[in-house]
C-alpha cells in the first residue's frame, strides 16, 4: 500500500479546514524513536520497537497508527497493521498470524512483535503515527536483516588486557604526579624554613651584644 493510502479523505470544505486550523494552536513536531537497523536470527521472534513523544495525551478516538512493509526503498508499501480506535491486524498472506501488537498507545509505545522470523521477512518496516491535535505525522523506519546463524562471540580478552594496561598506566602516572607534588611541597617548605632562620640570624647580628658597646 502506498503512503497516499494513509491520508484521510477530506470530509469538509477547504474554507472549513482553514477555519479549523486557524483555531487550533500550532503543534510541535512529533518525535518517533526506532532502531535504524535490526538484526534478527532466522526462526526467532523479533520485537519491532517504535515509541514516540508528543505534547498531547493519546485520545484513542483520534489517534491513528499504520505499520507497513517494503521489500526495498523504492518498492510499494503494504499495510499489515493499523489502529483506528482499536488494533486492526490485516493479516497479510506474507505474515499470516505471525504479527502481534505489543505496545500501548497510552504509554506512547506502538511496537509490534513478529514471530518466527523468516528470510523473506527481510526489508523495511514503517511506523506512521498521528496523535491529534499534533498536526505532524510521526514516521519511524526500521531495516530488518535476517541472520542465518548466530554471529560469533567477540573475544573480550584483548579488550580486558588493553583496559587493564591503560588503567595501570594511568595509576602509575597519577602516583608519580603525587610523589613529584609532595617532593616539591617539601622543598618549598624547607626553603621557607631556611629563609626564616637566615632572617632571624641577621636580626640577631644587627642588634649586637650590649656589653661590647660599654667597653
UniProtKB/Swiss-Prot annotation:
Q: What is the effect of changing residue 28 to Q?
A: In ATFB14; the mutant results in reduced sodium currents and altered channel gating when coexpressed with SCN5A in a heterologous expression system
- Which range is the signal sequence, renumbered to this chain? 1-29
| Cell location | Cell membrane; Cell projection, Axon
Q: What spans does the record annotate as topological domain Cytoplasmic, numbered to this chain?
A: 180-215
- Any idea which UniProt keywords this protein has? Atrial fibrillation, Brugada syndrome, Cell membrane, Cell projection, Disease variant, Disulfide bond, Glycoprotein, Immunoglobulin domain, Ion transport, Membrane, Phosphoprotein, Signal, Sodium, Sodium transport, Transmembrane, Transmembrane helix, Transport
Q: Where is this region: Disordered?
A: 187-215
Name a single GO cellular component: T-tubule
Q: Which residues carry this modification: Phosphothreonine?
A: 204
Q: Where is the composition biased (Basic and acidic residues)?
A: 189-215
Q: Domain Ig-like C2-type, which positions?
A: 32-154
Membrane topology term: Single-pass type I membrane protein
Q: Which PANTHER family does the UniProt entry name for this protein?
A: MYELIN P0 RELATED, SODIUM CHANNEL SUBUNIT BETA-2
Which disorder is it connected to? Atrial fibrillation, familial, 14: A familial form of atrial fibrillation, a common sustained cardiac rhythm disturbance. Atrial fibrillation is characterized by disorganized atrial electrical activity and ineffective atrial contraction promoting blood stasis in the atria and reduces ventricular filling. It can result in palpitations, syncope, thromboembolic stroke, and congestive heart failure. Genetic variations in SCN2B may be involved in Brugada syndrome. This tachyarrhythmia is characterized by right bundle branch block and ST segment elevation on an electrocardiogram (ECG). It can cause the ventricles to beat so fast that the blood is prevented from circulating efficiently in the body. When this situation occurs, the individual will faint and may die in a few minutes if the heart is not reset.
Query: What is this protein identified as?
Result: Sodium channel regulatory subunit beta-2
Q: Which gene encodes it?
A: SCN2B
